[in-house]
């Protein structure tokens, strides 16, 4: 596609608004992926990728998930996923896992599957491709997963207990509350009853033939995609797909995959829940709106929407983070972004999320709403938008620089989403060109106009979910109180946000340069060792792991084991405190603003026996990296606001540690291994 055509469409979009979206050109599809469809409807994606060499990833994506279950089938999609590993036409019993492990594929790490609301995906990765017979056997596994899962009675019976165990591990704390809340959040509609884990009563009681009927109904080639990416012969793979899959028939009068719509809510919905295992008081405010239909996602307007969502989320998150540093801020952290409403694909929502300080849930709810309302009324500033653009383009440049070092899973994930929901798949080069034309020409006025639309001003499609710690002394908000807060915030007279930016260099005066006193070259291992005039030793090594990336580490052989017991906790958290501090004349918040768009960062490290720094940058930003290293070593400055915020966050989590199963388990193991020593246990709040 001609870039001039894209640019003309962008100008049209900016001048005429979103009504012109449908007239914009299509997003180009990456020409390096071979996409085809067999006569029976099966779709395939094949891409040669030699990073890393001699391995490939094999996927089969099913355009079916828990939303396709009937009321008496809740959990069958998930149970069926488990049974794909317990016997197929060509791999009886556990021989599928045994075979893959024999060629180096490990179950859990390289071999797995997942069931979602609207898709089920099976995969195995890092398969050696030097033997054509191994590749062909892997193709046969995909064929069996398509229409050859055995579903024997013995396998079904044994897998019921496995699903029970998974349910016990997953449905804890916050997950429990979400599952309880979904029916009300979806006003009794189907999405409210289709959490993928399902009902254990269905898992226990379903007859084998019921599961087989579900399998035959939905696991069909017209609902499936074969995705293979790696160091393979594309033509051989395509021929093998045609050979293995062309003969699979689609039943007459096959059931259609139909989108399930989500109704608007005329009045606000408020759900308040509590759980003993919940670690923090958390709330989410959803402002619902229609999702972009799959049919329009290949349109350039969808790409523009994604960019606007990205920068809006970035800018409002920065405001929330800055506000959280104030001593009287009632929340610990907050963010916002536009995306799917809970688990549905047909309804989106601009979602505000906040974690309240203990006892401050209502105040935090108001504060998070207030900042969103401020965006609605005044929008963002030019300096905020410039930082967001710089950060966005920095990521674009990074992706372009590493386009030849993309791993297989970066592609397979894209192709799964393209098949199941028509997400665009342009090449990195084409997308980079688009952004380099679009971003400089998309004005702040358009961003602010779009942001204004996202923050709703009526109770229609407003939904709030509050999930709190269950404690004897806790006071929980009521629906009436939350509704009153919404009305109050909307009626407040707010002032526009003022973006205070420090217009100074990171280092006011460059330090006096030292000298290289000695250079030793190790040709065998390919590095140079420099000895500087201050005694520091520097090892330089050129690598080709990633293009356009520089990594850095500095280490000294003294760690927190040298500190006394009274300083142990201070030493344990020292690296976190130092990283949250300011540098030179910059507070941590001012530093974040100054580094926007830079691919450079340095952090402290502290272990029992070592301390040091680690970081990374690009060649373009290596000067910034060096400045940060120098400041981390010489000019860490106290930032009381940042320290207090971090301390409050840690205290909130640790105060409820006795109700956190994973922390209790960790504490018990550490206490046993180290004979009850407090130095090894989870800290007290």
What are these regions (language model features)?
Residues 45-47, 52-69, 76-79, 94-144, ...:
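M16 family metallopeptidases and their MPP-like homologs
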């Amino acid at each position: 596609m001609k870039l001039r055509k894209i640019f003309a469409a962008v100008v049209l979009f900016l001048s005429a608004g979103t009504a012109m979206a449908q007239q914009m050109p299509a997003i180009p599809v990456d020409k390096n992926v071979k996409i085809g469809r067999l006569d029976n409807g099966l779709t395939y994606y094949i891409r040669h990728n030699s990073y890393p060499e001699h391995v490939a990833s094999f996927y089969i994506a099913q355009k079916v998930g828990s939303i396709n279950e009937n009321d008496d089938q809740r959990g069958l999609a998930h149970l069926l996923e488990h049974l794909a590993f317990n016997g197929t036409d060509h791999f009886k019993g556990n021989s599928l896992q045994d075979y893959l492990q024999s060629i180096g594929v490990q179950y859990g790490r390289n071999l797995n599957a997942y069931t979602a609301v609207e898709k089920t995906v099976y995969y195995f990765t890092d398969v050696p491709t030097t033997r054509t017979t191994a590749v062909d056997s892997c193709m046969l596994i995909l064929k069996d997963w398509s229409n050859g899962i055995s579903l024997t009675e013995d396998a079904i019976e044994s897998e019921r207990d496995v699903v029970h165990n998974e349910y016990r591990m997953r449905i804890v704390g916050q997950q429990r509350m979400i599952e309880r809340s979904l029916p009300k959040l979806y006003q009794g509609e189907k999405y409210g009853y289709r959490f993928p884990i399902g009902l254990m009563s269905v898992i226990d009681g379903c007859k084998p033939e019921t599961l087989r009927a579900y399998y035959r109904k939905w696991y069909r080639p017209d609902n499936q995609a074969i995705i293979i990416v790696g160091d393979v012969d594309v033509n051989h793979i395509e021929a093998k797909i045609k050979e293995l899959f062309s003969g699979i028939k689609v039943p007459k009068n096959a059931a259609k995959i139909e989108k399930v719509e989500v109704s608007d809510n005329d009045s606000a919905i408020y759900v308040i829940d509590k759980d003993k295992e919940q670690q923090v008081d958390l709330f989410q405010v959803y402002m619902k709106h229609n999702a972009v239909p799959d049919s329009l996602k290949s349109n350039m307007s969808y790409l523009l929407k994604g960019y606007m969502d990205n920068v809006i989320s970035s800018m409002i998150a920065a405001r929330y983070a800055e506000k959280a540093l104030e001593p009287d801020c009632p929340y610990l952290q907050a963010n916002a972004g536009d995306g799917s409403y809970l688990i549905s694909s047909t309804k989106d929502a601009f979602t505000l999320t906040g974690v309240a300080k203990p006892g401050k849930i209502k105040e935090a709810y108001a504060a998070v709403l207030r900042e969103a309302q401020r965006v609605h009324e005044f929008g963002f500033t030019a300096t905020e938008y410039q930082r967001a653009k710089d950060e966005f383009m920095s990521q674009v440049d990074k992706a372009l620089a590493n386009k030849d070092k993309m791993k297989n899973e970066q592609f397979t994930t894209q192709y799964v989403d393209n098949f199941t929901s028509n997400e665009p798949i342009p090449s990195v080069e084409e997308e980079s060109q688009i952004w380099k034309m679009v971003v400089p020409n998309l004005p702040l006025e358009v961003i602010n106009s779009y942001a204004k639309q996202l923050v709703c001003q009526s109770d229609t499609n407003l939904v709030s979910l509050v999930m709190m710690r269950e404690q004897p002394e806790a006071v929980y908000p009521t629906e009436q109180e939350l509704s009153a807060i919404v009305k109050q915030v909307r009626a407040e007279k707010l002032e526009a946000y003022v973006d205070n930016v420090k217009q100074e260099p990171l280092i006011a005066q460059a330090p006096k340069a030292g000298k290289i006193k000695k250079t030793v070259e190790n040709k065998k291992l390919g590095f140079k060792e420099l000895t500087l005039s201050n005694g520091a030793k520097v090892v330089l090594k050129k690598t080709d792991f990633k293009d356009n990336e520089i990594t850095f580490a500095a280490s000294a052989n003294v760690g927190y084991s040298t500190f006394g017991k009274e300083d142990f906790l201070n030493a344990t958290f020292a690296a976190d405190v130092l990283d949250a501090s300011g540098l030179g004349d910059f507070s941590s918040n001012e530093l974040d603003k100054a580094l926007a768009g830079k691919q450079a960062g340095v952090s402290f490290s502290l272990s029992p026996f070592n301390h040091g720094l680690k970081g990374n940058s690009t060649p373009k930003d290596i000067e910034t990296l060096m400045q940060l290293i120098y400041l981390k070593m010489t000019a860490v400055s106290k930032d009381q606001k940042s320290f207090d915020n971090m301390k409050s966050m840690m205290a909130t989590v640790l105060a409820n540690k006795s109700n956190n199963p994973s922390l209790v388990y960790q504490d018990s193991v550490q206490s046993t291994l180290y004979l009850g020593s407090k130095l090894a246990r989870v800290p007290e709040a």
